[in-house]
Each structure stands twice: as C-alpha cells, then as structure tokens.
Amino acid sequence: MTNYQIKYSKVFKKALKKQIKQGKNIEKLLMVVDILSRKGQLDTKYRNHRLVDDKRFSNCFDCHIEPDWILIYKYLDDMLILLLVNTGSYSELLDK
C-alpha cells in the first residue's frame, strides 16, 4: 500500500494552532490523517464526503473529527500528496 506524503496549507497551519488553543484533542486529528495518508477507509462516524457545491474547495473532501470539528483535505494523486487544506468548525469553514 502506498503512503501519501502529507502537506499542509498555510491556512491549515494557522487553523491548527487555533484548534490547539481551543483545547481540541489533536490525537483524534492525527489518527484520521494517518488513515487518510494510507488512502484508508474512514469509519462512517467521520461522515467523510466530497465537497461538491463549494467552489472555494474544488476537488476537496471533508470529514468530521468531532461533531462540529471538520478537516478539509484533498488528494493530489499524480504526486502522491495528501494536502490538508483547513480545519475548524462547520460554521467557520462551510456555512458562508
């Protein structure tokens, strides 16, 4: 099985710092990222799906780390890269 190299957008890095300050359990995020980096299947509790109606996140997916904490990511298959695009609450990222 091929592992994807993990890359972080600048927006993601800033958002991650915010999640840490808010006391989020970053281990939950790391576990999900590990599964995604191996192109593994997430459990249905993560509600993983492609974002289709949001032009800001073209070709991206989102999954729920917690009920109101999501991770937006995309695969760059030609380069074997998992790009972490953003993280935060649904209302911060998608309810606009």
Where are these regions (language model features)?
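Enriched for short, Lys/Arg-rich terminal
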Residues: M1-Q5, K14, I26, C63-I70, ...
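A short, surface-exposed loop/turn module that caps and links secondary-structure elements
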Residues: S37-H64
